[in-house]
């Protein structure tokens, strides 16, 4: 064994020991992590060491601070503070049962066995007896099941069906865009989920998807702390959207902003790419003596001097006040998007729609980054290991915050910067 590798092995072991002594139950978590590390094979030690050294950079918390660092006394939190008028909301098909149970088992073990918030399950067709029994057996909390009517789920009846079908068929090469059901789902989450009668009874909601994993204990009530700190919207991952899915969404958004005379919020710059304007300014300075400019074509999503950087809050996890979605301002915005037809002529996702609405209507102090939570969906995860409680994140998947497609730099910028700069 090379001395270089030996030193890195011992450094990793010491790092793991220190980390889990500080933040975790030593006996269980350290053993589990070392077993996972050994299974990777020795040739991956250096990569694994790098992943563990990749610290999350501290962010200015003037406008948004973690609700907890480490573990709170969950028994005290659950017994002393009132429950909010809140629910989990799950959109699922009967065929999603296994994935739903996996997500429920995770959130129940990490959080809801202590706080017992109810669930609302929605489907575009009736749930089977098997589905209902299985999810009821997975929790002690109350559950309600709802079916979506045509108005909430299907495309508008006054829009030509052949035109919709042709538009969707033409979106070849755009991820999920050839599936009408995917367009319907994105439209439903963008403008209709909060209108269902079962959702109208609640003030807060927490979206729960099938096949997600919560990898840290949540030892406090996010709903209570959101309310206490005057937060309206909470997220756990901020990521770049695929440009082909939203070629004109930003244009329609800025147009609506101007038509409606909406003031620019202090969060709006989170969504703006300033590199093009900086480049143009530099090129003009370099070419000022030649009498003319040779400039690149502006991006397609540029409007009124603004360019969308494709950042959005990943809405498969979000905690939000429902009066935000029920507000006149939000519904005027999504009505404008509906009239533009982008839910079928393009593949607008609900995540960028929600996010741009948040940027239009909320200030930065009203949005919370759940940096202490651990959350994984598919191969993308955020691990709250340095802030969270009893985290057990997949050992070989880097925190998305440390990857190129993350929007952490944009978030830090709008929040006042990284503290280590």
From Swiss-Prot:
Q: Which UniProt keywords apply?
A: Cytoplasm, Glycosyltransferase, Transferase
What GO MF terms are annotated?
Answer: alpha-1,2-mannosyltransferase activity
What's one Pfam family the UniProt record gives for this protein? Glyco_transf_15
Name the UniProt record assigns to this protein: O-glycoside alpha-1,2-mannosyltransferase homolog 5
Q: Where in the cell is it found?
A: Cytoplasm
Which Gene3D superfamilies has this protein been placed in? Spore Coat Polysaccharide Biosynthesis Protein SpsA, Chain A
Natural source organism:
Schizosaccharomyces pombe (strain 972 / ATCC 24843)
Functional description taken from the UniProt entry:
Probable mannosyltransferase involved in O-glycosylation of cell wall and secreted proteins.
């Amino acid at each position: 064994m090379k001395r270089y590798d030996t030193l890195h092995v011992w450094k990793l072991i010491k790092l793991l020991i220190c980390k889990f002594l500080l933040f975790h139950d030593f006996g269980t978590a350290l053993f589990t992590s070392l077993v996972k590390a050994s299974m990777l094979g020795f040739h991956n030690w250096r990569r694994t060491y790098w992943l563990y050294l990749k610290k999350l950079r501290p962010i200015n918390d003037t406008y948004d601070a973690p609700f907890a660092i480490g573990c709170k006394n969950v028994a005290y939190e659950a017994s002393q503070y009132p429950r909010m008028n809140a629910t989990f909301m799950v959109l699922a098909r009967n065929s999603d049962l296994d994935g739903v149970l996996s997500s429920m088992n995770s959130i129940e073990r990490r959080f809801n066995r202590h706080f017992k918030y109810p669930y609302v399950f929605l489907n575009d067709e009736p749930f089977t007896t098997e589905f209902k029994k299985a999810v009821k057996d997975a929790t002690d909390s109350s559950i309600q099941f709802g079916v979506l009517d045509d108005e909430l789920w299907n495309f508008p009846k006054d829009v030509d069906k052949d035109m919709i079908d042709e538009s969707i068929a033409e979106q070849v090469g755009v991820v999920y865009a050839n599936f009408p059901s995917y367009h319907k789902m994105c439209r439903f989450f963008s403008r209709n989920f909060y209108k269902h009668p079962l959702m109208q009874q609640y003030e807060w909601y927490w979206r729960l998807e099938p096949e997600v994993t919560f990898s840290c204990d949540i030892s406090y009530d996010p709903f209570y702390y959101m309310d206490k700190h005057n937060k309206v919207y909470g997220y756990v991952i901020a990521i770049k959207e695929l440009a082909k899915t939203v070629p004109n969404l930003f244009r329609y958004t800025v147009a609506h902003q101007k038509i409606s005379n909406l003031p620019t919020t202090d969060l709006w710059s989170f969504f703006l790419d300033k590199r093009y304007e900086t480049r143009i300014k530099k090129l003009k300075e370099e070419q000022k003596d030649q009498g003319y400019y040779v400039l690149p074509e502006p991006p397609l999503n540029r409007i009124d001097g603004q360019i969308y950087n494709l950042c959005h809050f990943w809405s498969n996890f979000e905690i939000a006040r429902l009066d935000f979605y029920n507000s006149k301002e939000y519904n005027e915005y999504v009505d404008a998007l509906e009239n533009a037809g982008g839910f079928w002529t393009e593949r607008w996702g609900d995540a960028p729609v929600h996010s741009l609405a948040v940027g239009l209507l909320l200030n930065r102090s009203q949005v919370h980054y759940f940096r202490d939570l651990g959350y994984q969906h598919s191969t993308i995860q955020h691990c709250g290991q340095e802030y969270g409680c009893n985290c057990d994140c997949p050992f070989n998947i880097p925190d998305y915050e440390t990857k190129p497609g993350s929007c952490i730099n944009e978030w830090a910028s709008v929040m006042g910067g990284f503290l280590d700069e």
